[in-house]
Amino acid sequence: MKLIVSRSQISGCVHAPPSKSHTHRAFLLASLAKGESVVLSPLLGEDTLATLSAVKALGANVCEGDDRITIQGGNLHAPLPKGTVINCKNSGTSIRMLAGIASRLDGTTEFTGDASLCSRPMKPLLDALSELGAGVTSDNGCAPFTITGPVSGGDVHIRGDVSSQFISGLLISAPLGKADTRIHLTTPLTSKPYVDMTISAMKKHGVSVETIEDGYLVRSGQVYSSEDVQVGGDYSSAAFLFAAAALAGEIAVSGLDPADPQGDQVVISILETFGAGVVRDGENVTIRKAALKAADIDLANAPDLFPIIAVLASQAKGTSRLYGAAHLRFKESDRIMSTVLFLRSMGADISETEDGCIVTGPANLSGANVTTFGDHRIMMASAVAGLIADSTTTVDDAGCCAVSYPGFVKDMQKLGADMREE
């Protein structure tokens, strides 16, 4: 299904969608904790549902209620019945965190995903699990693969600059071993706030993580406790709403905890740097249109913001440089290339660099036919760009936003955006 976007002004109020990152972690930790945990206001998007389906297959008892998921955990197991495969669909978070958990289970677990996921790098994590003693089979360092455990613990070495999800997968699974686990990072850690989010979630469930000189230490003998978790709003998804307002109106977004450890909360200070009107009042953020000025933005710790910040930069006076996001080339698409392609097709003065892009604005954007490559963040960023384009923009895959923000189009329509699916 395509999305047709026409030039629009937006205004109004909307509640931020639930956090995808927090929902993944809540489902996984609840499944590892003995007893009953309730996850309140979770995001039920395609990625998080892949995680929920996987923990059910591995033995968690899941009950879906009204805006809540109740999970009876503590009994995950392998091997699974013959022929059962954990299909993580398009979710890199699911497959990477679950692979770590599978290495601690007594048996073999088989993983796969869709074509996009099966092209994304897994080798650093698979090598790390092998170093810990897991049996690993994979043809090319990507999915599909099998993991055979259990591993006890020990020292493990892994790059920190490919995906923070690798580190989170090792951390979450570490308490399940009989020995301490020391994770040594062989390169600097990118997207560190996501690892901090994992550590914070583990702490809420009773497990502590220590920082060592080159990584992390998780001591054995710790047990996850069952806890009820309220999932807060998602700054990554709210960024698209913020940018739409900064370019085409004024809106208020509620449900965003200022104390939340999400790294993408930095989007608010980025908007201020560009000159957008920003007012914060507790969990409410109001953004209004203003004349934007160019800025240099380091996205090493908030790479998911890249596509929408590039859209903002295209409308800022002067030359902006977005950098520090080389690992975006291994997302659902090569997200740097995908962003540059759609903005250039709309008339932006933008060029690709190894770890980001250079954008000179403001550009008069024109409608175009946008290829998303099945990437939800490209879909939403291009839809926002379409709000200020001189003619109609056609986005080739309206449905891919269901990965992280299923209600995106409806929320934008509620705010007055001229968007329709056909």
Curated annotation (Swiss-Prot):
Family matches, as CDD domains: EPSP_synthase
Q: Where is the active site?
A: D304 (proton acceptor)
Q: What is its EC number?
A: 2.5.1.19
List positions binding 3-phosphoshikimate: K20, S21, R25, S163, S164, Q165, S191, D304, K331
Give the top-level enzyme category: transferase
Subunit: Monomer.
Name this polypeptide is given: 3-phosphoshikimate 1-carboxyvinyltransferase
Organism of origin = Methanocorpusculum labreanum (strain ATCC 43576 / DSM 4855 / Z)
Q: Which gene encodes it?
A: aroA
